[in-house]
């Protein structure tokens, strides 16, 4: 697959005042992926929420990547796994850059095991999109 472009759809950075804002996990990542009907193009959307209890920071972001697909077999899984692996560093970088505008302490979200994230995500479904806006 080849990444054609990516778009940051939403990014939020805030200082946390209330303890109830903190989640049990520091990092939550969700993935959605889809293909055009002809399976030549794909889209992956990553959403991440990161909570830094020590520094009272919360960052959330949603980013989408648009891909050209050049494999024919198992393209649904291919776009979900490889598309996520390609896009995730862009998400990490955007979160880090936004957090450095506030202080010298950049928020660095950890790397992930893509297969583990996809296996553990209950609502994750591969779906075919009949129209993919490019």
Indicate where each model-derived feature is located.
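N-terminal intrinsically disordered, cationic/polar leader segments
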Residues: 1-86, 93-134
